[in-house]
């Protein structure tokens, strides 16, 4: 085995160890943050106002770019997420960890041009969001999401996202 192939092999193993250590570190930080964080829900019994329900959705949008906010997103325990019809989120814990570990969200640089509509006509309990994602690669995506956030509990029960790149 040549010196070059040994060096490349060692570099490859070192990079795997570094990635593993980075993920382990993120998990440990997440466990600590999860322990100290509570979902951001107004401190009074419902029904909750449109502004409070909008704030629940804004916390989710914040967590797309700020992993530290992941455990403050007020998900219902059985919350599901769909992207363009494909189920990508299965429960609150999985959604919070996805946001915290930030693997699929790490390309998002900024969430902008946010327009929220609470209870669009004929859709009680829905907060509709339209916004643009700017990525680190320079690609923009237009997103339209419907969040089911009933006034009774102010928790996000489901997210239906439609994403168009370009």
Predicted features along the sequence, with ranges:
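C-terminal and inter-domain tail/linker signature
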Residues: 3-166
């Amino acid at each position: 085995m040549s010196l070059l192939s040994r060096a490349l092999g060692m570099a490859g193993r070192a990079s795997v160890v570094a990635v593993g250590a980075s993920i382990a570190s993120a998990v440990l930080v997440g466990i600590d943050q999860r322990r100290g964080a509570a979902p951001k829900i107004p401190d009074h019994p419902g029904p909750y106002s449109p502004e409070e329900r909008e704030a629940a959705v804004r916390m989710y949008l914040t967590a797309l770019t700020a992993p530290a906010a992941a455990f403050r997103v007020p998900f219902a325990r059985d919350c599901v997420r769909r992207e363009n019809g494909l189920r990508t989120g299965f429960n609150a814990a999985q959604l919070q960890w996805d946001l915290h570990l930030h693997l699929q969200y790490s390309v998002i640089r900024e969430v902008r041009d946010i327009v929220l509509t609470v209870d669009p006509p004929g859709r009680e309990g829905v907060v509709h969001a339209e916004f643009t994602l700017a990525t680190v690669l320079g690609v923009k995506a237009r997103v339209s999401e419907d969040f089911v956030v009933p006034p009774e509990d102010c928790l996000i029960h489901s997210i239906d996202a439609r994403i168009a790149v370009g």
